[in-house]
């Protein structure tokens, strides 16, 4: 131990030692850091070298790639061979052809041996310029010989010649690098192709460009200022010439048969630096490839000498994910801001100044954006097939999924040989059947893919065309060079330009944007145009706008220009004004059915027109204008049809007004626009299954049904179904919502489940199985009636009553199509349709309905409705809606969205009238009133004929309403541009819980995203569909839930999976909320006079608190008023506006009653079935002598009025002590609750703030007592239960002992246990035992766990006697006992033997005893 005096010396030594260690440690760390920094610098140098080399390697992969060169050469030879063998022997060698092209580089072939006509085909020696001229010749002669029979052949030839021209251009730098091994010289040689020195000496076809555009702008200004010209946009395009609809040849080709004009177009585009676009077209792969090469040449020093900027090949860029492609582009274009995937590219791009971005980067931005969109569109379209992909999957998994689906294995196979590909049999199969697809040859084999393209592509249907493009896409995404080369001839990469026309603007408006761009350029600068498309030249936006204008407007010999042809085709041929209307009907991966495919220059025209027709193109660069243009895609297209917040009364009356004023011939025009077989498809879209009369027998006529013997008369089926929904709603706040729906009694055990940590997920999507058991039970009880049983079971069904046969057919159809059946309803108002009803009764009913509705709503006005079941044939319905939707898009100048919907409804009414062959003309006919309008010999028909009779009978009255409801759901969804975003929103992890929430309607996400409940009632369904879900007392919630299920099916048809699940899961919760809301709203508005009276009183008191004088003297107290003058000093108390101390004592009385009513209303928190039913559980063994109480529905019952009293007590308590809070609730009553939009958001606010405060108040008041009651109840129940079990188990043993003691006391102590039981063998004991188990039993207490419900005792026998026959009755004389068998019986095995009976009871979906009556079998 260190002494006190030595302590300072010891501390000094310790300090010096630590100091030395610290210094050494610092030195060591410094040395380590130096070493690390050296290593880091070394690694950075290595990485720098790698990055430097990587730039060069990326360029080499484009112009020094042996594999790419090899594949391009192979495809070139395949194309040359196919041109030689092509059935279309063109172009012919005519007089003057040799002056156009160098014949020495072409092969000449005779068409036939006997014919002197010769056609020419290119060779390997043909250059790029030779193929350009060859393409001109083909187009010239194709226009001359065109007819519909050779249309596909022309398209195919034009595609492969354009592909050959692209290959020739791609091979130029590849061949150069192969010869010279110099990257820059290879790029320069490519550049030489577009450097045309001879063009400088030639005169331009439009003369001086500056003068031309000056005159153009003057002409435009004159037209705009001329008030006499009505359609200025059309005049700008067509001029003074009124062009009528032209021949198909003029539509299909951009130019007429004039090679000189084609060359002029090439020269114009070259002069403005657009040569690449002109020769390649908007092919996403080819144009991107050469744009990257152009960028490499322009920035060669930065990319490959200074190496300060990263460089990537186009093929490598496409290999990245959709978000990373933009990161790479930013790195290549040396942008300061790099894109991150957390935000949309549009938002991040527009935040940074991009005004100095080169045109090449702008075009690459456009190409990447629409390649991503193309990729998503292809993947989205797979949802129509049997396998699903999603856009965020890794590329490897997309490939694996695709081949797993096509080949049943992730390994590659030739998809054309698979059974999956052959399902769409629109082609002749020349290959033998194979059990296993060929995996030795790659799926991306150039020869096979090109062979199938040339041989069969034109005959492919939608799915096969999709598979071909998806195969190529998987190769591109996984950096397969063969797929990169194969993409050059696929039409989908040209058609992608169509996706960019999304705005709902007229074509002439888009053209005005191009004119504005030219005006801006002309006023800002007078720039001399370049004379070629030199890749080193900087192309400006002005070059692009002017070049695009000249390309689209050039013409010769008064032949219409491309722009004029396209405009006439839209406005007069198709009779539409918007390009987007045309594009929406075209598929991006489609085959030769697209008319644009006759001439690829149509795609070039659309591409150049698209780049220069964005709204902000005059002020922004191309990419900025593009992103600003698609900004509108994020906004909701709000119309009367799609806007779910639109006031429903206004919407209803507007809809009826439009229907009433639709021209009579508009329906006829719609029929003419449809295909010939569409009307038959409309008839097949729905199949009615459950007949109205069948449901009415169990509902409206339930009192006429004979009750089963010993049981009460059954309640109406719609009442039972409605009660079930309300019961689910009442159980949901306690956490018992849909938990184990098969057994409603399971909620008694849920507290024990929580303690045992056993989780049972709610089965929310199987709620209809419970309803199925209720419906089947009701039908079974009907068939158990004595007279029905005698007719149906014990007599020949040949002479059976039509009504009984209809009942049996309806339930059979329902059972067989249970998963697809939907139930709709209509109002059942007999007096309205019966001519014998006196007029005064009709007037009386109308007045009563008005009085019932005017101060609230029409909730529960009718008890019963007309309920029927049907199923939707989704495939046929989808085809019908697609056709009608395309008709609408093509004819927006004729139809608005509302008028088109009502025209379709009138068309459905016409179809409905074709079913009315059996209906009587008089309205009073019972057949018409109760829909028994089936054939008189209905019961004698066979099953198929009876099903047709049911369908025709129901369709004669309800086809139009039912079909139109399904159609409007699909049409309004397709019309809205918000559904895509909404589906994505509900796919997010934070919103998935909203779909499964039992109170989703009170969550902000549910309301903010559009409240699917309001979407169903006010957007997806027509106005008449709201009647049954409001006015029916029995069945309204059941019907509304079926509306949700129909919406789920419709969303699923449109591949909105998340919205489909949302509707499916909310079919019960939201439907219940709507019904309860309507009932509360109905009664709440009845208190308008009372609420107004108290509001006036409150205003007067507020005036008194602030000024000291009442605004209305009548509300002042008599003691404070003298001679009609108020005493100001007695009232003035401004702080009372927030809290009134004087009324606190009075309010406490109401607080007590509020507390008391909470005990009753909140009992479910601890007692799932309520406190009363919980007490009854103790007496379940006692048979009740009374019938069950009538099931409750969403109406004015005991609980409702108790809640009303609770609300009054709450108001009298808190409104009195705080006027500020009272005014807040008054605002809600008068304003918020009367506007649906405000009411939904207020509900969310009320849940998170006001209700939260109420819940906290309850936690310290009523909830404490309820919890205490629960604990006391469980304690008493457990004590009594244990006592009963112990007594029940001891009772049989006591009886045995008593019996033996009474019969033979002398031998009682000598008897063994089985002797006692043998003595008691003729007795049996039965007791109630719920299989409780006693823990920690001692040896003397083990008998407590020995239990049996029914224990018969068998006399002991010898083991040898077990095999004796029953006739050996004297064997008991044997005295020798070898081994005795046990006299105890294994009751569990006995129960297993009787499992056939017990299993039926265990597995049956027995419904609640408050609702159901046991079946009789």
UniProtKB/Swiss-Prot annotation:
Keywords, comma-separated and alphabetical: Cytoplasmic vesicle, Disulfide bond, Host cell membrane, Host cytoplasm, Host membrane, Membrane, Signal, Transmembrane, Transmembrane helix, Transport
Claim: Zinc is one of the keywords in the record: no
Chain residue ranges for the region called Disordered: 1383-1417
Top-level taxon of the source organism: Eukaryota
Subunit structure: Self-associates. Component of the RhopH complex. RhopH complex is at least composed of CLAG3.1/CLAG3.2, RhopH2 and RhopH3 with a 1:1:1 subunit stoichiometry. CLAG3.1/CLAG3.2 mediates subunit association through independent contacts with RhopH2 and RhopH3, which do not directly interact with one another. Interacts with RhopH2. Interacts with RhopH3.
Protein's cellular compartments: Host cell membrane; Host cytoplasm; Cytoplasmic vesicle, Secretory vesicle, Rhoptry
GO MF annotations in UniProt: cell adhesion molecule binding
The species this protein was found in: Plasmodium falciparum (isolate 3D7)
InterPro entries: CLAG
Membrane topology of the entry: Single-pass membrane protein; Peripheral membrane protein
Disulfide bonds: 333-361, 407-413, 517-545, 521-542
Keyword Membrane: yes
Signal peptide boundaries: 1-24
Protein name: Cytoadherence-linked asexual protein 3.1
Biased composition, class Acidic residues, residue ranges: 1394-1411
Residue ranges of the TM segments: 1204-1224
GO CC, one annotated term: rhoptry
Primary location: host cell
Role this protein plays: Participates in the formation of new permeability pathways in Plasmodium-infected erythrocytes enabling the uptake of nutrients from the blood plasma.
One GO process term, biological-process aspect: adhesion of symbiont to microvasculature
């Amino acid at each position: 131990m260190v002494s006190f005096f030595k302590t300072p010396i010891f501390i000094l030594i310790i300090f010096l030692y630590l100091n030395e260690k610290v210094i050494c440690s610092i030195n060591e760390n410094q040395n380590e850091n130096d070493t690390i920094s050296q290593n880091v610098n070394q690694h950075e140098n290595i990485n720098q070298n790698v990055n430097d080399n990587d730039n060069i390697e990326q360029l080499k992969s484009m112009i020094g790639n042996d594999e790419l060169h090899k594949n391009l050469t192979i495809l070139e030879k395949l194309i040359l061979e196919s041109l030689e063998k092509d059935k279309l022997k063109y172009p012919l060698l005519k007089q003057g052809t040799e002056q156009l092209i160098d014949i020495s580089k072409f092969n000449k072939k005779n068409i036939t041996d006997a014919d002197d006509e010769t056609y020419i085909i290119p060779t390997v020696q043909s250059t790029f310029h030779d193929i350009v001229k060859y393409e001109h010749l083909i187009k010239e002669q194709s226009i001359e010989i065109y007819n519909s029979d050779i249309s596909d052949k022309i398209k195919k030839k034009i595609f492969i010649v354009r592909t050959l021209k692209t290959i020739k251009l791609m091979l130029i730098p590849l061949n150069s690098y192969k010869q010279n091994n110099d990257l820059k010289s290879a790029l320069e040689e490519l550049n030489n192709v577009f450097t045309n020195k001879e063009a400088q000496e030639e005169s331009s076809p439009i003369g001086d460009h500056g003068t031309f555009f000056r005159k153009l702008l003057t002409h435009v200004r004159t037209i705009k200022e001329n008030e006499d010209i009505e359609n200025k946009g059309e005049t700008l395009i067509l001029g003074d010439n009124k062009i009528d609809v032209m021949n198909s040849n003029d539509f299909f080709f951009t130019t007429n048969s004039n090679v000189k004009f084609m060359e002029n177009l090439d020269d114009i585009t070259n002069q403005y630096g657009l040569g690449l676009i002109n020769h390649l077209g908007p092919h996403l792969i080819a144009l991107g490839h050469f744009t990257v090469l152009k960028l490499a040449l322009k920035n060669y020093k930065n990319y490959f000498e200074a190496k300060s900027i990263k460089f990537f090949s186009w093929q490598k860029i496409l290999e990245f994910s959709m978000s990373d492609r933009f990161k790479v582009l930013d790195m290549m274009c040396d942008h300061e801001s790099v894109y991150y995937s957390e935000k949309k590219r549009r938002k991040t791009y527009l935040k940074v100044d991009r005004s100095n971005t080169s045109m090449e980067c702008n075009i690459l931005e456009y190409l990447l954006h629409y390649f991503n969109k193309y990729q998503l569109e292809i993947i989205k379209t797979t949802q129509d097939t049997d396998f699903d992909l999603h856009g965020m999957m890794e590329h490897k998994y997309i490939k694996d999924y695709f081949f797993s689906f096509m080949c049943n294995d992730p390994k590659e196979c030739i998809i054309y040989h698979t059974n999956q590909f052959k399902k769409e049999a629109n082609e002749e199969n020349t290959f033998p059947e194979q059990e296993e697809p060929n995996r030795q040859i790659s799926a991306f084999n150039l020869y096979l893919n090109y062979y199938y393209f040339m041989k069969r592509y034109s005959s492919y249907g939608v799915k096969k065309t999709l598979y071909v493009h998806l195969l190529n896409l998987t190769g591109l995404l996984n950096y397969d060079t063969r797929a990169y080369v194969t993409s050059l001839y696929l039409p989908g990469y040209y058609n992608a330009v169509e996706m960019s026309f999304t705005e709902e603007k007229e074509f002439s408006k888009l053209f005005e944007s191009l004119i504005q761009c030219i005006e801006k350029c002309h006023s800002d600068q007078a720039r001399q145009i370049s004379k070629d498309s030199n890749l080193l030249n900087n192309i400006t936006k002005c070059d692009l706008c002017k070049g695009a204008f000249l390309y689209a407007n050039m013409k010769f010999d008064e032949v219409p220009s491309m722009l004029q042809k396209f405009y006439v085709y839209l406005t007069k041929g198709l009779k539409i004004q918007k390009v987007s209307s045309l594009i929406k009907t075209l598929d991006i991966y489609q085959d030769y059915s697209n008319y644009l495919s006759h001439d690829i220059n149509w795609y070039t025209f659309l591409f150049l027109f698209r780049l220069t027709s964005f709204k902000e193109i005059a002020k922004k660069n191309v990419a900025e204008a593009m992103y600003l243009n698609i900004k509108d895609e994020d906004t909701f297209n709000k119309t009367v049809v799609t806007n779910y917040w639109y006031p429903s009364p206004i919407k209803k009356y507007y809809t009826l007004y439009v229907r009433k004023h639709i021209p009579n011939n508009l329906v006829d025009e719609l029929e003419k626009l449809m295909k010939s077989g569409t009307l038959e498809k409309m008839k097949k879209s729905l199949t009615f299954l459950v007949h109205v009369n069948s449901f009415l027998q169990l509902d409206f006529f339930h009192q006429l049904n004979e009750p089963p013997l010993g049981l009460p008369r059954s309640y109406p089926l719609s009442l039972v179904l409605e009660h079930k929904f309300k019961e689910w709603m009442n159980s949901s706040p306690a956490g018992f919502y849909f938990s184990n729906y098969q057994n409603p009694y399971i909620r008694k055990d849920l507290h024990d489940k929580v303690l045992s940590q056993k989780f049972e997920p709610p089965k929310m999507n199987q709620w209809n199985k419970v309803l199925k058991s209720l419906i089947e039970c009701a039908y079974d009880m009907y068939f158990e009636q004595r007279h029905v049983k005698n007719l149906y079971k014990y007599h020949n069904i040949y002479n059976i009553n039509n009504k009984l046969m209809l009942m049996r057919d309806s339930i059979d159809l329902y059972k067989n199509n249970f998963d697809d059946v939907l139930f709709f309803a209509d109002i059942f108002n007999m007096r309205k349709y019966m001519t014998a009803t006196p007029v005064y009764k009709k007037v009386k009913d109308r007045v009563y309905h008005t009085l019932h509705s005017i101060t609230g709503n029409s909730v529960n006005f009718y008890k019963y409705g007309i309920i029927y079941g049907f199923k939707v044939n989704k495939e046929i319905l989808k085809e019908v809606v697609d056709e009608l939707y395309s008709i609408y898009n093509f004819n927006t100048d004729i139809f608005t969205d509302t008028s088109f919907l009502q025209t379709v409804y009138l068309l459905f009414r016409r179809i409905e009238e074709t079913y009315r062959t059996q209906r009587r003309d008089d309205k009073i006919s019972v057949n018409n009133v109760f829909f028994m309008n089936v054939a008189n010999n209905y019961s004698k028909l066979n099953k198929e004929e009876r099903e047709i009779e049911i369908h025709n009978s129901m369709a004669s009255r309800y086809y139009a309403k039912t079909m139109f409801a399904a159609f409007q759901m699909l049409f309004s969804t397709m019309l809205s541009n918000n559904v895509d975003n909404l589906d994505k929103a509900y796919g997010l992890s934070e919103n998935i819980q909203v779909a499964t929430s039992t109170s989703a309607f009170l969550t902000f996400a549910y309301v903010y995203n559009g409240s699917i409940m309001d979407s169903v009632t006010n957007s997806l369904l027509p106005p008449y569909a709201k009647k049954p879900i409001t006015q029916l007392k029995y069945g309204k919630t059941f019907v509304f839930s079926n509306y949700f299920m129909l919406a789920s099916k419709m969303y699923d048809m449109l591949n909105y999976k998340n919205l489909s699940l949302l509707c499916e899961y909310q079919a019960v919760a939201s439907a219940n909320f709507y019904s309860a809301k309507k009932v509360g709203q109905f009664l709440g508005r009845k208190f308008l006079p009372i609420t107004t009276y108290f509001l006036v009183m409150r205003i007067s008191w507020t005036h008194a608190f602030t000024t000291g004088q009442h605004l209305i003297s009548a509300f002042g107290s008599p003691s404070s008023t003298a001679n009609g003058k108020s005493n100001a000093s007695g009232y003035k108390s401004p702080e009372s506006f927030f809290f009134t101390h004087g009324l606190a004592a009075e309010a406490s009385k109401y607080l007590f009653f509020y507390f008391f009513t909470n005990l009753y209303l909140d009992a479910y928190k601890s007692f799932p079935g309520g406190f009363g039913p919980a007490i009854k559980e103790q007496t379940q063994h006692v048979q009740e002598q009374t019938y069950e109480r009538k099931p409750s529905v969403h109406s004015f019952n005991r609980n409702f009025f108790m809640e009303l009293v609770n609300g009054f007590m709450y108001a009298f308590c808190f409104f009195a002590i705080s006027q500020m809070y009272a005014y807040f609730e008054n605002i809600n009553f008068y304003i918020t609750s009367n506007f649906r939009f405000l009411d939904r958001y207020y509900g969310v606010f009320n849940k998170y703030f006001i209700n939260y405060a109420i819940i906290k108040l309850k936690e310290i008041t009523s909830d404490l007592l309820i919890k205490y009651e629960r604990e006391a109840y469980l304690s008493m129940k457990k004590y009594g239960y244990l006592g009963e079990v112990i007594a029940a188990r001891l009772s049989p043993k006591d009886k045995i002992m008593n019996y033996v003691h009474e019969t033979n006391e002398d031998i009682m102590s000598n008897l063994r246990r089985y002797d006692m039981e043998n003595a008691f063998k003729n007795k049996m004991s039965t007791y109630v035992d719920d299989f409780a188990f006693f823990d920690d039993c001692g040896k003397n207490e083990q008998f407590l766990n020995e239990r049996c419900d029914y224990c018969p005792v068998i006399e002991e026998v010898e083991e040898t006697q077990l095999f004796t026959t029953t006739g050996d009755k004297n064997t008991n004389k044997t005295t020798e006992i070898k081994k005795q068998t046990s006299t105890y019986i294994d009751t569990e095995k006995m129960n297993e033997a009787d499992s056939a009976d017990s299993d039926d009871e265990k597995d049956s979906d027995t419904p609640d005893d408050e609702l159901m009556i046991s079946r009789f079998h």
